[in-house]
Amino acid sequence: LCLEPALPDGSLKTFRKGVADFTVIAHGRSAHAGADPHRGINAIEELAYQIMRLRQLADPRRGTTVTVGVIRGGTRPNVIPEQAEMIVDVRVSTRSEMSRIEAAFRSLRPILEGARLEVRGGFNRPPMERNAQMIATFERARAIAATLGLALTEGGTGGGSDANFTAALGIPTLDGLGAVGNGAHALDEHVRIDSLPLRAALVAALLTRWTV
C-alpha cells in the first residue's frame, strides 16, 4: 500500500512511468575563440548536436518523453569550451521502451572530430505497468471501497513513487492511497482536508478486509 497522493479526483494510480536521469558529458579542447579557433573543439557545440539526436528518441504515442533539463558549460565568451554537460530526464511507460532508451544513450557517439562523450546515470525507477495483476488488485480494492460507500476510480501519472519498485517485483500494489489534492511541486500545492477521514477509512478497510 503506497500512500502517495491520489489523483486530483481521488483516483488511485494503476500505472506510473519509469524514470531515468542521464548525464551526458562532452569533452573537447579549449582554445582562444578569436586567435586560435581552429585549435579548439567546442564541447557545447557537441552537446547541441546530441540534443537534436535525443529529441528523436521521444515517442508521444508510446508515452516516452526526453527532456534536457540542465545544461552547463564554458568559462568565458572568448574561450572555446573544453567541457560541457547536460542532464536529461526520461519517462517511459513500458519496459520495452526502457530498454530502447537505455541502449540509445549508451550508443551515443560524438559528431565533432576529436570530441569525446561520457554517459552516466540511467533508470532509477522501472515503469509501473497496468497489467493483469494490477487490474485484479485494483478491482479487489474497489469492491472493498464500495462497502464504505466509496466509488473508487483509477488513473495514472508520469511521476514515479516507491510503488514502481514493488509492482516491478510482481508484488500486488495499490498506489495513490494518500491525501486528495492538487498542484504537486507548485506554489498552489494543496491537500483537501475533508478528504483525510475518507482516505484513512479506505486504508483501514484495505488492511482489515483484504484476504489472501
Q: For each of these PLM feature ranges, what is it?
A:
Residues 5-10, 14-15, 20-212:
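Metal-dependent amide/peptide-bond hydrolase catalytic core
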